[in-house]
């Protein structure tokens, strides 16, 4: 065990015994850790350990079991995420995705920063689907998946239009469409936007407008990539998918 200070983002918590809780926190310095909080309801920092909060932790880090929190300060609460069920669903999904992407205790400050920035953008009102798509695509390599959407897999032509081939795990230009008769037959704009989302920095992201029809095509394609190359099935993703018809009902 060692005492340390680190930034930490609360992923989730669950009850443990009658009055205690286990709180999973993605720390900047020590990766994802499970913290034991005794008498959670009476804890002076219980409100700082809710979902969608980030803060500075003073803690005892244990590599072989539960870690322990001494204090939480400089707390940031993503209030808009907590208040809006649709933003909340997208945030919950990317948190689950980050949790699945690396092992517990694995040091990954880049992923911590990427997740934190994604939540900040969601909280600031950036397009939920766009932020989520960017996160999904840029976290793929942590699942061991490396896909190139910027050029033809055969001739390396970098000017589209392109289609995607699962057979070759890459893009095809029109000259090489015949190499895979079962290619995806995508709208060329899907590949263009997928490549953009895979490469863009969240710090460069500006508020953009994408039509619902195009968003649906992108969603379907990314789902296909995850089914083919990753193979995880998260409850948060299933819940998010089930919300597709809610917007019209709640108007």
From Swiss-Prot:
GO terms for biological process: DNA recombination; double-strand break repair. It holds the Pfam family RecO_C. Keywords: DNA damage, DNA recombination, DNA repair. The keyword Nucleotide-binding does not apply. Gene3D superfamilies: Nucleic acid-binding proteins (2.40.50.140), Recombination protein O, C-terminal domain (1.20.1440.120). The keyword Nucleus does not apply. Transmembrane segments: none annotated. One of its GO terms (cellular component) is bacterial nucleoid. NCBIfam families: reco. Involved in DNA repair and RecF pathway recombination. Belongs to the RecO family. This is DNA repair protein RecO. It comes from Lactococcus lactis subsp. cremoris (strain SK11). The lineage of its organism: Bacteria, Bacillati, Bacillota, Bacilli, Lactobacillales.
């Amino acid at each position: 065990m060692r005492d340390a200070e680190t930034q930490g983002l609360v992923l989730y918590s669950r009850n443990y015994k009658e009055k205690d809780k286990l709180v999973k926190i993605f720390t900047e310095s020590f990766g994802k850790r499970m913290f034991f909080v005794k008498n959670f309801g009476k804890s002076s920092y219980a409100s700082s350990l809710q979902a969608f909060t980030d803060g500075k932790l003073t803690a005892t880090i244990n590599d072989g079991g539960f870690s322990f929190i001494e204090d939480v300060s400089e707390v940031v609460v993503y209030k808009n995420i907590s208040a809006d069920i649709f933003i909340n669903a997208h945030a919950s999904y990317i948190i689950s995705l980050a949790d699945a992407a690396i092992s517990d205790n694995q040091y990954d400050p880049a992923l911590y920063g990427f997740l934190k920035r994604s939540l900040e953008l969601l909280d600031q009102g950036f397009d939920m689907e766009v932020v989520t798509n960017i996160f999904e695509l840029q976290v793929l390599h942590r699942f061991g998946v490396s896909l190139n959407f910027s050029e033809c897999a055969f001739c390396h032509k970098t000017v589209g239009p392109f289609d995607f081939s699962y057979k070759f795990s890459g893009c095809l230009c029109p000259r090489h469409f015949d190499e895979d008769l079962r290619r995806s037959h995508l709208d060329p704009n899907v590949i263009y936007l997928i490549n953009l989302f895979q490469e863009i920095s969240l710090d460069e992201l500006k508020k953009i407008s994408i039509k619902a029809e195009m968003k649906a095509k992108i969603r379907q394609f990314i789902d296909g990539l995850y089914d083919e190359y990753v193979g995880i099935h998260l409850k948060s993703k299933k819940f998010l998918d089930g919300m597709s018809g809610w917007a019209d009902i709640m108007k």
